[in-house]
Amino acid sequence: MLFRSKHGGGVGVFLGDVRPAGSPISAGGRSTGIVPWAQQYDLASRVVSQGGVRRGSFAIYLPIDHPDVLELLQSKDHSKGDPRRFVDSNVGLTITDDWINSMIAGDEAKQELFSEVLKTRLISGSPYLVFIDNVNRQNPECYRERGLEVSTSNLCSELTLFTAANHSFVCVLSSLNLARYDEWREWRGTSGLSVPELSTYFLDAVVEDFVHKASRITSMGRAVRFAQKSRALGLGTMGLHLLYQKRGLPFASEGARKLNLEAHEFIRSESEKASRQLACDYGEPEWCVGSGFRNSHLLAIAPTRTNSVISGAFSQGIEPIDANYFVAKQAKGTFVRKNPVLEALFCEKGIGAEIWKTILDARGSVQHLDSLTDK
């Protein structure tokens, strides 16, 4: 795990098979449970750099019915002052249909636990919730045909791939900037490829580069094996809300819904076209044989906090913008971020720069501005 982080990977860790605290151990003694293990991964994220560029990243997954789940949640809740708390690793819970249906049907113990889960999410932003039976129902056909079931997720919970004792799932990610969708929707390069097609070719090439380089690293054998058999990609998007604003569409409007479907259907169909062509040119990997595709997975909506800043997308992933003006503290420094669509609107209306101070005081809101209307 540490070597994967060192060489640039974000890591998801499933601890569901670890004995709960107090369980007897065959060699004598008692299990210390999940939390000490979680602390070790949390420490590792602080001392191991990710690709030599930034601090390592881990996400720890646990089934919601594991006896140690409450203790894990309390360790993530910074408000409780738990000395065993950890702050740098994310936490995720896998939830089965039976568990959630029982909770909804009135199981009081499960309802109390789920209430704690939601409180912790409100305070810390995690745990992620992965409805694992639903995930396996939606697995690609090549997975279902081979009985490849998913048990956990990745660092940021945007991917659900098979993993086992001799396979560690690997996926390469990139996101298209929907804030500039109107510019690249009809673009075709000299090769005749669309942006999603070209992006799929690029990501598949990154997989090949990973296999070539990681094959020379002994500790990466399981990851290389998975990449060779699956070649999973994760082409996503960012800047969706900014696209809506450029079109004058409220986030929850019917027009926004239609635009969302149009854009992502275009990306899906073009990415599939590229993967089919790649399969014709270079062959299908082991787990895709008979599917006609070069890649077991193609799309994933990842968080894009840094990428959205670099690319000018402003809004992260497919999330709504929560502030039009804010101060962002990042690894390279502290920066002021302004909504570029709003800034252009102010210029159009002749509204002076002093207006931004009032927006900052209103925590990024523009509800107080008489100079703006619903139209």
Model segments located where?
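Long, C-terminal-biased catalytic regions of enzyme "large/alpha" subunits
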Residues: 1-375
